[in-house]
Each structure stands twice: as structure tokens, then as C-alpha cells.
Amino acid sequence: MTPIAITPVAPVDIIYDLKHTERATESSPVTLLDVFSRAVSQYPDHELSFITSSAHDSTVHTKTFAEFNQHVHALAQAMRAWGKPTGSVIVVYLTEHEDNMAAVWASLLAGYVPCLQPALSAQQAHKEGHVGHIKNLFSSATWLTNESGAEQVQSISGLDIHLLSELKASAEAGVDFQAHQPNPDDEAILFLTSGSTGFSKAVVHTHRTILAACHAKGESYGLTSESKIMNWVGFDHVAGSLEMHIAPLLYGASQLHVHASAILSDPLRFLHLIEEKSIQLAFAPNFLLAKLTRDLEKRSDLFGKFDLSSIKRINSGGEAVVSSTAQAFARTLQNLAKDGDASFVISAGFGMTETCAGCIYDPINVLETPPSYEFLELGTPVAGCEMRIVNPEDGVTPRPDGESGELQVRGPMVFVRYYNNPEATSSSFVEGGWYRTGDVGIVEQGKMRLSGRIKDTVIVHGVSYGIPELETYLQTVEGVTHSFLAAAPYRAPGQETEGFVVFYSPTFDLDSEDAPAKLFATHRALRDVSVKLITLPPQQIIPIPINQMEKTTLGKLSRARLVNLLKQGELAKHIDRAEELVSIARGASFVAPSTETEKTLAGIYAGIFNLSVSDMSASENFFELGGTSIDVIRLKREGESAFDLPEIPTIQILKHPVISSLAKYVDSLISKDASQEEYDPIVPLQLTGNKTPIFMVHPGVGEVLIFVNLAKYFQNERPFYALRARGFEPGHPFFTTMDEMVSCYAAAVKRTQPHGPYAIAGYSYGGVVAFEVAKRLEAMGDEVKFTGLINIPPNIADRMHEIDWTGGMLNLSYFLGLVSKQDANDLAPSMRPLTRKEQLEIVWKLSPPERLVELQLTPEKLDHWVDIAGSLIECGKTYEPGSSVSVLDVFYAIPLRGSKEDWLNKQLKPWAGYSRAEPSYTDVPGQHYTLMDFDHVPGFQKIFRSRLEARGL
């Protein structure tokens, strides 16, 4: 068959052949500022809407195009006052879509070049290395960020840091402003690559490349001024900023931008927003399609309840889309839709930062046209883009139709160069302007599909992680022969998302008597390291004798060769042997579910974690399987439905995470023989590992669910216990004094761990309680090697006196995500004259219905919860820190009020007077109420664990 290169059908010249440099006409903008001004003048009342990252503010914030225009012009005028030369690079490091969007447009209007910075690493060395690299790359270092971002980079010298809050404060609306007039080939926006295989490169996109891409995307999507799109991809990603903002803006389409955490923590919200906002175009990567399907396909109570008639197309990218997943998702949508005959188009796509996001698409109705392959085809190029498959060895020899090879693309939407990196630019292109994507693909009958990657990365939920770095950490695991380990990206047949496989040679004989125990321990350690580094365990871990692990002449293991052996079945005997040994090791503790309740729970556990029911032992622990706080809610709901129970209290799931134990509790509910349990503050969230346990005291709301996601990072390292306040269960009285609470908690800690050394910490209000418990343990003659205080000062009495019932109720409501921060601050004066019932009714009406369902709240439960929080406030009103402990570790985040610097120096540094050794003060990402949320807990756990290790624990 003849080699081929695929070009789009009937490309429209005006879309990509923008060779003129004169100012734009109304019909053909040639710069991004032309796009912006035309959208504002033609569609001033169209809207940009936003939902923030805060779990405590679910409201939709909206600006019309005209209002947004005034806002960014004022910011641009204020930016001009910085006195930077035209063309200066501004590193934009912000969290929210609206802030990022405003910063980018203000930079362009002021004549600067914005560079969008993704979230920085929580590891100090990585962060400092990256920021230093960026500073050298741009030969300057102007950063526009928020208070949290400034704190993260303050240790790096030579940065010119500007706060967005200060920029907003200095901006004057209505001031005459002459916007910069760029040329089409000027640098427009810089995007940073993931840096998964080294330091990030800065991808240069000009006005011309971005406009070419956006015209082609809009034509492919069928965008018009009446379109409504929804995006939840971060603005620092090309899909979030170019594909889902600038392309729709080019056509005047209204937009809704939702922070990813609002969707990932509540996938059902994706459908609610489509219905409420009449969304026509949305984006959902494969892992979200799979998660939505798993969460919703069994929700028969929701079938026929959603009006999804508006949605015309759902784009999916970032990783290959499994055909069966796409079909199951479309079928689930069909079940949920009021119109049972509704059809849904899912468009898998291919794109990269270097191609302005998607440049190859295949929009199909997967139910009407069943896919032919395991993964959805990626289709054909957009207008102006070409693709071809070549021999990856020489990078130029075309491969015949149907034969795999290196995917290359070219066209006007492909990036111009890597900033200040001519070597990387040169190596990325071959003769004829073809860009080497690093992906392996196949083209058949004009349509492309991917079959792998040349680059050493693995994609987890759309984020690339470097394989070499992962291997470095895996090599340190006991039981692994040094330099005889390789990890490789892999997607098993039928697997929903991409994963990876670990190949290694064990240091022990697989035929020895103790091989089962050693292999089990090694594989568990490899899994734990992987989860902590990239949040994903290996799909398979394959031990191969060292004499069968061939190395190249350079002394390296070939990942490609090992993956090919796996695919060809050549490693089957090693896999079978490993499974046999692991089965022997597990057999000692495996207990088959025996009662009907145990069997039902085993099925629910298996469904949540996508495991085989036959593998579920009655001794399985929910949290050791990887259960999160969201999974707890799912277990609660499915359990209540399966057993026809009005309620399974969340705390009982936390206290009975093992199938057999939870089954006994459920049986007692079914027989209505659930006697009142004696109060025990200890909630075991994680029981594996041999290191010193950690005891974590509840915040001021009394509950401990917030610690579930943190606890899983300590699996097989150390037990993790939470302490929950008294008063949640009927018949349990509130604490009345701090001394009573501390005495109860100290006794519970001693019952759980009779002898030291101890490690205890507390979040917010719980910090002072943890401090007092540590003092009590030391008074008993025990050693406390770690006392962690998370964002709490030593002197809290004055603050406790400030909080009345209304203030406490609003604080709790904000913490639970029922009201916004602004509402919590603004409502108190008008609510205080009202009765408690009237105040609760106001909060209830403001609360998102899905959040109330998730928390299983009723007005009565909320009222009682306010009283519990109030009892803790009362205990703190007379609190005095008093004497000291041996050592303190203070963790600080952005405070509720004031600057982070003042918070540290004026409020937290006084802890030094209550520590016999110099305390440590450690900065953690996030704000007071968000530092352990979905986005921040991966970074927080690394920092927290490093302090435990620093204390010899």
C-alpha cells in the first residue's frame, strides 16, 4: 500500500492563510485583541460565568463581555505603571479561571506576553529548580500571582512579584487607555510543557497560530454567537484557554468556566450544569466519562430526570477514550435524559500544547455508529492541519495505510518555537515543517488512532508524569535488585484509562520458602510508592529473574521490549507465578464473605474500587483499598439502598471500615438491635504500617471526614487515627470544658497506643487541643516526639468570644460548603435579630441541593451540628496555653483574615514561648479551609510526612 499524509477536506484559506498584517476588519480579526474587541462590540451582553475552586462557594459568578472588558482595561492600565518594556514576559500564576483570564487579557492589552504557570510542585527542591529555570529562560522574572502563590516562591531570589489583589486595588475604571497594537506574528501567549522528562519548555504561540487554531476549531464544533460552552480544564492548559475560551470568544459564544475540583468532587454536577445553563459544547476526558458512568449508571432514581436536549457535543482528550466507556456513558446519558431517544455525540480528539490543543477530531454518535476498535478513533485533521505516519527510526519515511509509526502533524496552528531553546525547537521538526508529536499512531481509511507513545511519560487523569523519576523512587524499595527495574505506560485490553506496569528482578529466590511473604511485601511497597508519587498504583507488577532481564549495550532495560513481551504473552509464566505467590500470602488472611450482608457489602466494595467480587475478603478494609471521602458517601448511599435502611451513619462507616465489622453493624440496624455505643473519640482511618501512629484532632466543627483523604497516604507506613468530638450520637452529651475534652482524648490515645513515643496533631481549633493532649501525655511521663499545629495560634480565647450562635452557624455553613465566604461575612448582621429557625431557613435556601444530599443533611441535623460546634467554642473561651511541650511543628496557610506574613509573625510565632525547643514553621499550599481539600491534600501530605521524618518518626 502507498504511504500517505492526510490533509483536511476542502480547507478554507481565510482560516489559516493570514498572511496580511493590516488591522482586522469586522469579518477577519488577525490578532487576539481584534477578537476581544469584536466580541465586546458585537455581543456586549453575552456572558462569561465562573464557579471557583472553593468548596464553600458554589455560586456562579457572571460578567458580561462589556463588564469584563472594562475590568481588564483597568487592569491593563495599572500594569502599564510597572514600566516594563513592550514584549516583556509576565508569568501568570493564579488559581481561578476568572483571575487567569483577566490577567492574560490585561497583559495583552498592556503589550506584555503572558506565560501561564501550572501549579508548582509541593516539593521544595523541584519548585525552586523550576522557578529558577523559568527565571533564567526569560532573562527576567516578573510574576503576577496571589498571596498563596507569592508565599510559594518567596524563597527564590531575584523575582519581581506583583499581587493580583494589589493590581485590582490600583486599577481605575473608566480611565482612557490606548491598548497595545500587536502584529499577527508577535508572541501572544506562552505555555509551559509538563516538564515530565526534565525542565519545562515554553511553547511560543503567536496571534497567527492561535487564530488559525481557533477558526478551525470553531468550524469543527459548529460554534455560533448563540452557542454556550462549559469548560472545567485549568486555564493554564491550552484546552482551557484556547480551545474553550478564545475559540468560543471568536464566535461570540457565552461561556461557563468551572474549577475542576467542583466537578471531580461531585461528578453529578456536570449534568446539572448542562441542564441549568443549556450547555451545547462541553469537555470531559476519558477518566471523567468513566467516573460519571460508574456513579450514575445505577442511579435509576435519576432516570428521565435531566433535560439534556441542549448538549450537541462532548469533546474528550488528554488520553485515549475507551470505546466501551464512551458507549456506556452515552447510554447512561440516554437513561438520565427526559427524552429517552436523545442522541449524544462524543468526539475523541488529539492535540498538544504545541498544536493549540485539539487539531484532530472524530465526532460520532457512539450508539448509532458502534466504534470498530477498543479505543475511539481520533479522526481527521481540522481545516489547515495535516497528519502523517512515519518510521520512528528516521522520522521521515512514510508508513503505509494501516501500519503503525510515529505521528507527525503540520499546519498554521503548530507552535512557532520553544522560547530561548533553539536546540529543542530544531529537534522537534523534520524536513517539510512536520512536527514530531512523540506519539505512535495508525491511519486507516483516512482516520487516525493512537497505539502508544515514544516519550517516557504516563498520563494520570490527563496529567503527564515522568517515568524516569518514578523509577528512581521505585528502585529504592526493599526486594528490588538495583538497576533491574523498569516502569512503562500500559493500557490493558478493556481498561478504561491508561496506567503503567512495573517490571523488576527480585533480590530473593522466588522458589524459597519465604518468597510469598517477601513478594507480597515488595509489591505492596511498590504500590505505596506509586500512589504517593503519582496517585496511581501499577496495573501489574511482574517479577522476572535477573538472568532473564536483558539490558541494552548501554546497560539499560528496554521498556518497549518488555511491553512487547507482555503483549505477546511471553511473560505469562512470570505473571502466573507472582499471582500464585501473592495468593499464598493473602490466603493466610483471606476469609470468604459468609453472611448475606457480608456478600452484599463485598459487592458494593468491589463496585466502588472496580475489583472482582471473588477477590473480596471479609477482612478487606475500605480505606486500605483506597477509599476517599467521596467514596465514603457512595458506600453510605449504596448501603442504605441495598439494605433498605433510612440511614447508615457516616461515623459508623469510619469506625467499621472492614467488611465483616460493617456487616455486623448493618445487621444490628436491620434487626433494630443497634444499642447505643459508648462514646469513643478514636476513629481509625488507616491501620497498616509499623511506624509511630499519628493521632489527628478534629477542627472546630467536631467532625473528622476531612482527614479521610489524608489518611490514605499513610497506608503501610503508620496507623492514622482521628479524634471526633462528643455529641454527634444520641445520648452523648457535649463537652463542657477544655479539661474534660483533653482528659477524654488523652485517655483514648493511651488506650489505643499504651506507650510512646507519640505523634499528635490538630487542624485549626484541634491544634490547641492536640497541644494540650501532648502536655497531658508528657505529664504522664511519656515522650511526645511530634506535636503538629495546623494553622492555629496559641491564643484563641478572644476569637472564641467574638463568635456568637449566628457567627458559629455561618462559619460551619461555610466550612461545609453550604454558603459562600462572602455570604458568611455579610449575612450575620441582618440575621442576628431572627430566630434560630429563621436563620437556618435562610442558610438552607442558599445551600446547593447536591451538597445537602452529599452530606445527608436535614435542617434538624444542621441545627444540632451548630450546637456541637458551639459547645467547642464555649470550651475555648477560657483557654490559656500555659506550660510548654518538648517541641512543636507549626503548619501555616493563608489565614481567614489578614496577610499570611502577619499571620505567621504576629499570630503563630508566639508558639515559641510554649516549646522547649525551637519550633518549626512550615508553609503549606491553600487557604485555611482548603489546605486539606481535593486539590491540596497531595501536596500537604508530602510536607506533613517530611516533618514527621525530620522528627525521627
From Swiss-Prot:
Residues 592-670 form the Carrier domain. Its EC number is 2.3.1.-. Optimum pH is 7.4. One of its GO terms (biological process) is biosynthetic process. Coiled coil: none annotated. Disulfide bonds: none annotated. Residues 37-460 are annotated as: Adenylation (A) domain. GO terms for molecular function: acid-thiol ligase activity; transferase activity. The modification O-(pantetheine 4'-phosphoryl)serine is found at residue 629. The keyword Hydrolase does not apply. The keyword Phosphoprotein applies. An L-tyrosine:2-oxoglutarate aminotransferase (probably invD) and atromentin synthetase invA5 catalyze consecutive steps to turn over L-tyrosine into atromentin, which represents the generic precursor molecule for the entire terphenylquinone and pulvinic acid family of pigments, which are widely distributed secondary metabolites in homobasidiomycetes. The first step catalyzed by the aminotransferase converts L-tyrosine in to 4-hydroxyphenylpyruvate (4-HPP). Belongs to the ATP-dependent AMP-binding enzyme family. This is Atromentin synthetase invA5.
